[in-house]
UniProtKB/Swiss-Prot annotation:
The gene is trhO. It comes from Ehrlichia chaffeensis (strain ATCC CRL-10679 / Arkansas). Catalyzes oxygen-dependent 5-hydroxyuridine (ho5U) modification at position 34 in tRNAs. It comes from the Bacteria. It catalyses: uridine(34) in tRNA + AH2 + O2 = 5-hydroxyuridine(34) in tRNA + A + H2O. This is tRNA uridine(34) hydroxylase. The active site is at 178 (cysteine persulfide intermediate). GO terms for molecular function: oxidoreductase activity, acting on paired donors, with incorporation or reduction of molecular oxygen. Residues 122-218 form the Rhodanese domain. InterPro entries: Rhodanese-like_dom, Rhodanese-like_dom_sf, TrhO, TRHO_N. PROSITE patterns: RHODANESE_3.
Amino acid sequence: MGYVVSTFYRFVHLSNYYDIQPVLKEFCVQHSIKGTIILAEQGINATIAADKQSSLDEFFSFLNLDDRLKDIRYHKSFAMHNPFSKMKVKLRKELVCLGIEDFDNSVCGEYVSPQDWDDLISRSDVYTIDTRNTYEINFGKFKNAINPQTKCFRDFPEWAISWASNKVDQDPIIAMYCTGGIRCEKSTAFMKDLGFSKVYHLKGGILEYFKSTQNKNSLWEGDCFTFDDRIAVDNKLVPAHVKCVSCDVCVTPEEMKSITRGHVLCFNCKENVKI
């Protein structure tokens, strides 16, 4: 039996997000939907899975009852095993934690469609910046993309300020991307706040790029890390064959469930290697 996986987000003011939590949790449990939904005053961010497309269709129909969450665009992929073991609906101060107080993320960069992305990042005058964490980037990235070497998203502002110190006067063209689009959207707003004017981000992130282009120009190198038990997907959105970093043997679905922050070890090696 296969599973349908949906990833989505929306920046929107949800003043009553505390009240939304139990309602969403109950609906998902009743419809056998598992995954993680994050709610904040800034909006919603989620990856959920079900064994039937109809269950997810009902979920999005349920969201449509709230005008603020109506017609949310989502990315769909598939997995042979359910990538989640339970349903979580979390409350957060920030939807994605950049760690900047009183930061307005509404003035963000311009979207670039997956179809136009390759042309943009192939230009010699464009800086392509990966806004994900290093352990994610280790699985794969766009060719020649800058790796900020961050351990978590909260590290990004410090790197960006340092990187901008000798470049903001040049006002270069900046292209940013992440897994599903939410982090690069917020990152472009931060770069604009630093003084850059020509800032762009990949609409729908890497997942939408894979779906729309199948990496036809081979500018993506490797796989894409996912925050679930699949660990990573290839450019066809199929769960990747992830190998143990110690013995180079593909890990099993059960072993994948124990992987933390992209550190891939099979059960045998985990007993002998100190993380």
